Amino acid sequence: MALKPLHDRVLVRRTESEEKTAGGLIIPDSAKEKPSEGVVVACGEGARKDSGELIAMAVKSGDRVLFGKWSGTEVTVDGEELLMMKESDIMGIIE
């Protein structure tokens, strides 16, 4: 099943968080924070102005992005957990 976001929505795959601290301690899953960065999997075509003019998306598939801790809605596609969020929830592109 493929999921294509509509309008100004973006589908993001979270990057995995570190398993160990800098000191070598292993972090259990229950203590890990969900990462607030990920890779864009798919994008909608963009939002539209009242005049109907399309506002192009600033992000594209493959971009590494930074987003807020509580951004997006978790969705499962083909057994993989992804986040669906508005483009405005993305704070920046990591280069």
UniProtKB/Swiss-Prot annotation:
GO terms for cellular component: cytoplasm. It is found in: Cytoplasm. GO terms for biological process: chaperone cofactor-dependent protein refolding. SMART domains: Cpn10 (SM00883). Keywords: Chaperone, Cytoplasm. It comes from the Bacteria. One of its GO terms (molecular function) is protein-folding chaperone binding. CDD domains: cpn10. Its main location: cytoplasm. Heptamer of 7 subunits arranged in a ring. Interacts with the chaperonin GroEL. HAMAP family: CH10. Together with the chaperonin GroEL, plays an essential role in assisting protein folding. The GroEL-GroES system forms a nano-cage that allows encapsulation of the non-native substrate proteins and provides a physical environment optimized to promote and accelerate protein folding. GroES binds to the apical surface of the GroEL ring, thereby capping the opening of the GroEL channel. Belongs to the GroES chaperonin family. This is Co-chaperonin GroES. The lineage of its organism: Bacteria, Pseudomonadati, Pseudomonadota, Alphaproteobacteria, Rhodobacterales.
